[in-house]
Amino acid sequence: LSWNGKYLLDTYSSVTIPQVIEIIQTETQQKKTILKSENPLEKYAVGTTELIELKANDGTPLYAKMHKPKDFDPSKIYPVLVYVYGGPHAQLVTNSWLAGSYLWMPVFAHNQKYIVFTLDNRGSANRGFAFESGIHRQLGELEMEDQLTGINYLKTLPYVDSGQIAVHGWSFGGFMASSLMLRHPGVFSTAVAGGAVTNWAFYEVMYGERYMDTPQSNPNGYEKSRISNYVNNLKGKILFIHGSVDDVVVPQHVLTLMRTSVSQKQFFDFFLYPMHAHNVSGYDHVNLVQRILDYIVEHNVNKKYWK
């Protein structure tokens, strides 16, 4: 808004509109378009994007998005990658360019002939206090319930191979990916959990106790969400990735989980990025994305082919 209130600068995009910038006169509502972007991806092999509305078990609307190959054929069968965050303060599904996705998602969808699916579960941002607060003292419960609603929807689609569903997430999304894989064995063939919270008692107090209260006042909530309780449920393949100097989700999370997996004779894959904090940045980020996607393509195979 201009200093005198006469003009408004409006910038927007949608799933079908890359970007528009307009100047609007507040009194007359007259508009002048100063930028209308062409599709910068028109000539590239990038998948399509669509928005989906589902219903939670209690009837709450849930919003999701799906990327398909550019040459999608509904008569064919496709594997699925579910990209998840699921925590407070984040909204992954928006009616904006690419629906708010990272560019690698529709690129991966086309290049590897995948369906890439993301759903904003209860607890995520911009849906009001009631939508977020249901997760209080029980992180992971409603979130997984809603993510499984998304999985059940995917399984109704004739072009989805329900035996080839992988899940990936980072940070809270890493907590979600590992929880979904280990607490609902057999639903996913493969998981990649990056920077994952594995025990909320290890996490920073200002966040963990805001949503879980203290470990002393909510022992059942902390114990139920602790990933190491479920290591023997593994069916399929799971990769944990962590930065060696992560100061947000400290390495104690993943190292204690690895210790438990070894003691219980389970085989989790693990990769540590030396001298990286919570987010693997710079050129190494290219290595990270390639590592994640290669792992998914290699291991996300239909369960009927498992040895």
Residue ranges and their predicted role:
Residues 1-307:
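Serine-hydrolase catalytic core recognition
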